[in-house]
Amino acid sequence: MQSAKPLFDYPKYWAECFGPAPFLPMSREEMDLLGWDSCDIIIVTGDAYVDHPSFGMAIIGRLLESQGFRVGIIAQPNWQSKDDFMKLGEPNLFFGVAAGNMDSMINRYTADKKIRSDDAYTPGGMAGKRPDRASLVYSQRCKEAYKHVPIVLGGIEASLRRIAHYDYWQDKVRNSILIDACADILLYGNAERAIVEVAQRLSYGHKIEDITDVRGTAFIRRDTPQGWYEVDSTRIDRPGKVDKIINPYVNTQDTQACAIEQEKGNVEDPNEAKVVQILASPRMTRDKTVIRLPSVEKVRNDAVLYAHANRVLHLETNPGNARALVQKHGEVDVWFNPPPIPMTTDEMDYVFGMPYARVPHPAYGKEKIPAYDMIRFSVNIMRGCFGGCTFCSITEHEGRIIQNRSEESIIREIEEIRDKVPGFTGVISDLGGPTANMYRIACKSPEIESACRKPSCVFPGICPNLNTDHSSLIQLYRSARALPGVKKILIASGLRYDLAVESPEYVKELVTHHVGGYLKIAPEHTEEGPLNQMMKPGIGSYDKFKRMFEKYTKEAGKEQYLIPYFIAAHPGTTDEDMMNLALWLKGNGFRADQVQAFYPSPMATATAMYHSGKNPLRKVTYKSDAVTIVKSEEQRRLHKAFLRYHDPKGWPMLRAALERMGRADLIGPGKDQLIPLHQPATDTYQSARRKNSTPAGSHKVGKDPKTTLIQTQHTGLPPRGSDGSKPWDKREEAKAAAMARNKQAAKERMDAAKGGKGKGGKPARKPVVPR
């Protein structure tokens, strides 16, 4: 794989003399205090500004600041007018626009298209502080505010909408967001390299329209430039006329002339020697090859072509062998350069080692930002995921190659949290990333890695070229928990259990020291049909890991539980599959409360299946096998009801479905039967977590969850209490103990008031006031 210029090798911009700001400014008053007369770059984001490396605007802002640029932040502006977009003045170089850490549509709507009642990235968790399709709206307002200032579009929303994409909320294929947003250039994936290169070039006076050779960018152009070889992939191959094989020794440019000479009937002398001229065919080099995808008009009207385009796109995601792509949108082309080169360990350390304040901007006062509260004591140790799950967009956004931080950098960040972050109690809530256990796991051969086009390194089985050694991660865990002032290191990121079982030593280390009562894992299903479409391992891998987990838990003398979570209504899932999953859940004693239905997010492979009914994991043709799709609201409710087989509200629907499927034998009181024959006299079931089902502003909380239930959020964790706490949090234990002491003291005071007698007629002891 080709190398890239290191992030720390660029010359600094002249404004470096101002030094790093305590916080990137959000107002003119803050700019004045810093001595700035203007911003070089202004970042507009749909999230509240938290100066922490888990928030995209903080990473990009601090990175640009480290290059010497003066960077301002406009967080969650009022998009109804251009006024908020002008409050920091006109930027000298460009506006950087992002919707935030989440796609704005997924952030606002549930998988059933219901409006969410909260927003974790907003102070107070308040919903409604960002528009739908925020990247598009913000870009248009920036252009309205300052017409001639370039707009650089980035973030996960823009990244996953860079190509013509199926939009679940409108149920149609939309243009590339670059067309609708009026932006000048789009940066996709983790954009550190691209944003620094673009900023540096603009600072040298280059025009934004001339920046067309930066990896990880998309832009609009009129036609294919000279010197490029275009591969036409606008149609699906089909049987047709086979052309006559041309004589390879004939100069094709002179074929017509040869035909004329032959018509003259001249007879050549067989004894006369002739010089044969062999013409070199034009060589197709990867660096100058572009693949033309079907146009937006074609994929909008032909779902099979859409699936074909999705397949080609995903085959061109390896930075080592990816070629440029181009897609026609009306009269213009949207051009996609190959993905960015992954960052080295030194560069990852550089990015995560910048002077983050690690707290929200002071402008928010004491208002809590739920997303920050969730991650303020967590540490990101790597990026990327080679799992390739078709319903997930992490691989499309962060890449398949794992980008690791050094152990020294991670330890420094833990020490910084210990010494700097308010409220630290000695517990690191997570040491992970997109997955918990892919740290320093990679292909054994860089050459093979650069040439590979497989969508997953672990499906249908673990690739023999994948190094599954967990020793670096084990050493990191041991070093982290040995730090003074650190009481506990928890692992809250999702565990890839099919990888973990390859290293029993790792499972033992994890279970013995790093599980806080619950460990979340994601089998997603039990049946082969949906698992194959998800590219997830069979349930046998889960069973193997469960045995190891229980063995090492028992050896450690602990009481710990696995929290498996599942997806309903995923492409490839039949009613019978969901029935079998429900039987498995009941047989294993699981009662899932909060259920996640499949959410068709932009650009995901499973979304292409959902829209087209075809499987882009294989060659797509009009006659290729169809994929079972669950689209109707009624069937989606049925699949969720199977997962919540214990909820009486779903029993009438399940009875009708089981009778229709010829499985009425599963209706009855037996332990091997799924649901009772009759409804209860009163509905006693109540969800332990009713988020998104209560009106905005309501703070009702259900009854305490029973220990036999699995109450899972979309993260797979048990539900939070009314105050946002976690069940295993030590603070909750202390609070419960204090309440018990209060009750005991109150009882003793009452006894004293009644006659000064305690138990057995003895004088009551003086009440103890709890501290």
Swiss-Prot record:
Cofactor binding note from Swiss-Prot or TrEMBL: Binds 1 [4Fe-4S] cluster. The cluster is coordinated with 3 cysteines and an exchangeable S-adenosyl-L-methionine.
Source species: Pseudomonas syringae pv. tomato (strain ATCC BAA-871 / DC3000)
Gene3D superfamilies in UniProt: tm_1862 like domain (3.80.30.20)
Domain Radical SAM core: 371-649
Keyword Transcription: no
Molecular function terms from GO: 4 iron, 4 sulfur cluster binding; catalytic activity; iron ion binding
Record field: compositional bias (Basic and acidic residues): 726-735, 745-754
Residue sites binding [4Fe-4S] cluster per the record: 385, 389, 392
Protein name, entry field: UPF0313 protein PSPTO_4928
Family stated for the protein in its record: Belongs to the UPF0313 family.
Claim: Transcription is one of the keywords in the record: no
SS bonds (residue pairs): none
